[in-house]
Structures are given as structure tokens and as C-alpha cells.
Swiss-Prot record:
It holds the Pfam family Aminotran_1_2. Belongs to the class-I pyridoxal-phosphate-dependent aminotransferase family. LL-diaminopimelate aminotransferase subfamily. GO terms for molecular function: L,L-diaminopimelate aminotransferase activity; pyridoxal phosphate binding. Pathway: Amino-acid biosynthesis; L-lysine biosynthesis via DAP pathway; LL-2,6-diaminopimelate from (S)-tetrahydrodipicolinate (aminotransferase route): step 1/1. Homodimer. This is LL-diaminopimelate aminotransferase. The gene is dapL.
Length: 408
């Protein structure tokens, strides 16, 4: 009998979203006629926009011809998509990113989880609290976190509390972290950061030889001027930061699967003997070993997101979701809830009513309003007493959900 990776036994019982699904299933079985409105997990509801559909249809037709058939593609991504990403997502900001620094993948969740494989297992990890669970759980699996304590924190992680008192901006740790996870616009709090704050993080990383893992999956939802869209807007960030982007929420690709990661050539890691190693080369080796690339049809769809018509259609979808966010924010505020986020991100972070715990509030909304959200404590101990609602629902469902919640 083979021995197992015992680090998996250190994971908290049940990943957050399966636990939500389990509770909803139990309720549904007992109340089969109940209309449950789901504002929890961040899946999109609008269809793929016409420009993208048309591009994928044409690509599919190509695949049915001798001259247009594509088998295994380049693992890093087709050049036509890499160029579009470099030109539109970075060139438009005055940032020079080379095609060889971009790696197309099947999702930011995968990238955020897999990137830790190229770092030493004794690396010291710093995460915000609350935090997207994937950052923590994948490091638990790798054996970096130590044991979980009674307070829900792992002994070897550096936790950076993001609270109402500090504007949900995690403070730079006093100790040295080898790897720092940052996410802006933030999941779960829906808040954003400033360029000055990012400058301070870059300075910290340079001083401590740290690597920043910057999750910018929700960049397209930024609406206010002056909010940074990329950490590479900060001078010197290419020497210390890896950035993650996704088409999932931007263009509704949750069922298609396409994202990318940027690893600048300037970015280096070190061996135990002190030798510098290119992280771009290291990730390229990992990526080409474990991944066969995103399909040609999907990448042609992703390329169409950057066409003038594609951009216009996608902005219409984003505006739809952000109108939902405004409805949620305004409705909850009028009902007396303390609400954060939802301006530059599709998530609304609210204080639970009557000082209920996050899971008690979840049960209250499910049982009394038939509305499903996400308990804040599932994102970390500092999320206790908070709750996340997603703006990705249908307009009429969002309106009905808020009416139900505010009538409690």
C-alpha cells in the first residue's frame, strides 16, 4: 500500500464552496418547491458575447478542414493571442511585456495553485486575511504551512489582516516573507488598492528578496480613474512580481477556460547555494511538462475579446454585472447593513446582522430568504462576521434577492 501525502490531512474539513453546495442540497431536498437565488460562488450568468461566439464558430469550421486543422498547439499559447494580450492589456497602459513572458492557461485558479510548485517547500508565505482559499490550500498541500491552530490559522503562514479598521488593506509584514499573495480588485472584499501602496509592496519585495504573486483576475471591473490595473504600473515591479489575469469573469469564459500568467524575464529566484535562476524559464519548463495548451478554438475566442466590437460587447456585460453590484450595495445600505466593495469589483462584502457568525448568517439567508451567499469565515479567521455576495446573477434574481434580504 502506497503512503499518502499527509499534508492533505492538514486541510480544513471541506473546501468552502463544496460545503455551501452541501448545505443548499440538504435544504433543497427538504424544500423542493423553494426558489433558491444563488449569489455565492462567482460564476457568470450572461452568455458569451456574439463576437467571441462568431470567432469560435469560424475556428471550429477551420478545424474541419485539412488546411485549417490544429492539433497540439504551442503550450505557451498561440502567437496571435499572446500579441493581443501584450498590446491591449499592457501596451495600452504603457507597459512593455514580451510575448515570451506570457503563458496562456486554462484558468487563474490553476495558475495561482500551480505557481507555488517552482518555489522551495520551505519558503515563507504571506497571505491577506480574509483571502481566496486556493492560495492557502495549495501551500498546505505542499507542506509549507505547518499545523492549523484552534484560531483557524496555520502555524507557519504569515497572516496580514485586512479589516474594516485598515480599509481592508493588508499591512506589510514586519518579518521577511519569501512569497506574498496580493489580489486586486480583491476577492472576497471587493476593495482596491492604490499605486502608492503597490510601490511600498515592491520596495518591500526588493528589500527582502521576496516574490509578489499578484492576482488581477477582476481588473476589467475597475471603473474609477487612478486605480491601478496592473502591478507593472509600478517601476521595478517586473523584478519582483508575477501577475495573473483571466478571461473567466471578464468575458464569461468560466465554461471555456482561458487565462494567462505574466512572468517577466527580469524576475529571478535563487538556489540554496545562491545561484540566480530565471523564474520565466523555470515556469516554462513546468508549464510545457504538465500542460498541453488551451484549445485553438478557445484561444481564437479569447483573441476576439480584443477586437473593437468584442471590447464593446464585453463592456456591456461588465456594466450589467456592475449595475447588479450597485443594486446590492444600495439595497443593503438602505436596510442598515454595513457594506464594502462593489464599486470596482463584482463582489460586495457586508457585516452580518445581529452580530451573527458568518455561517449562522448563511443559514439565516438560506432558510428565511432562500438566498445563497458566501460566509466570510470561509476566507479566513478575519472574515468571521462578514459575508460575500456576488453580482454575477441575473438582474431580476438580484433584485428579488435584495428584496427578500431587506425584508427580514
Amino acid at each position: 500500500m502506497a503512503n499518502i501525502n499527509e499534508n492533505y490531512l492538514k486541510l480544513k474539513a471541506g473546501y468552502l464552496f463544496p460545503e455551501i453546495s452541501k448545505r443548499v442540497k440538504i435544504y433543497s431536498e427538504k424544500n423542493p418547491s423553494a426558489k433558491i437565488i444563488r449569489l455565492g460562488i462567482g460564476d457568470v450568468t450572461l452568455p458569451i458575447v456574439p463576437s467571441v461566439v462568431d470567432a469560435m464558430v469560424e475556428a471550429s469550421k477551420e478545424m474541419g478542414t485539412v488546411g485549417g486543422f490544429h492539433g497540439y498547439g504551442p503550450e505557451q499559447g498561440y502567437s496571435f493571442l499572446l500579441k493581443s494580450i501584450a498590446d491591449h492589456d499592457y501596451g495600452s497602459l504603457g507597459i512593455k511585456i514580451d510575448e515570451s513572458e506570457i503563458f496562456v492557461s486554462d484558468g487563474s485558479k490553476c495558475d495561482c495553485g500551480n505557481i507555488q510548485e517552482i518555489f522551495s517547500t520551505d519558503s515563507k508565505i504571506a497571505v491577506a486575511d480574509p483571502v481566496y482559499p486556493v492560495y492557502v490550500d495549495t501551500n498546505v498541500m505542499a507542506g509549507r504551512t505547518g499545523e492549523i491552530g484552534p484560531d483557524g490559522r496555520y502555524s507557519n503562514l504569515i497572516y496580514m489582516p485586512a479589516t474594516k479598521e485598515n480599509g481592508f488593506q493588508p499591512e506589510i509584514p514586519k518579518e521577511k516573507a519569501d512569497i506574498v499573495y496580493l489580489c486586486y480588485p480583491n476577492n472576497p472584499t471587493g476593495t482596491v488598492t492604490t499605486k502608492e501602496s503597490l510601490k511600498a509592496w515592491v520596495e518591500y519585495a526588493k528589500k527582502n528578496n521576496s516574490i509578489i504573486l499578484y492576482d488581477s483576475a477582476y481588473e476589467a471591473f475597475i471603473s474609477e480613474p487612478g486605480v491601478p490595473r496592473s502591478i507593472y504600473e509600478v517601476e521595478g515591479a517586473k523584478e519582483v512580481a508575477i501577475e495573473f489575469r483571466s478571461f473567466s469573469k471578464t468575458a464569461g469564459f468560466t465554461g471555456l477556460r482561458c487565462a494567462y500568467i505574466v512572468i517577466p524575464k527580469e524576475l529571478k529566484g535563487r538556489t540554496r547555494s545562491g545561484e540566480e535562476v530565471s523564474l520565466n524559464s523555470l515556469w516554462n519548463r513546468r508549464h510545457t511538462t504538465k500542460f498541453n495548451g488551451v484549445s485553438y478554438v478557445t484561444q481564437k475566442g479569447a483573441e476576439a475579446c480584443y477586437s473593437p466590437q468584442g471590447k464593446k460587447e464585453i463592456q456591456t456585460s461588465i456594466a450589467y454585472y456592475m449595475a447588479n453590484a450597485s443594486k446590492i450595495r444600495d439595497g443593503l445600505k438602505k436596510a442598515g447593513y454595513e457594506v464594502f466593495g462593489g464599486v470596482n469589483a463584482p463582489y460586495i462584502w457586508l457585516k452580518t446582522s445581529d452580530n451573527l457568525s458568518s455561517w449562522d448568517f448563511f443559514d439565516k439567508l438560506l432558510n428565511k430568504a432562500q438566498v445563497v451567499g458566501t460566509p466570510g469565515s470561509g476566507f479566513g479567521p478575519a472574515g468571521e462576521g462578514y459575508f460575500r455576495l456576488s453580482a454575477f446573477g441575473k438582474k431580476e434574481d438580484v433584485e428579488e434577492a435584495i428584496a427578500r434580504i431587506t425584508s427580514l
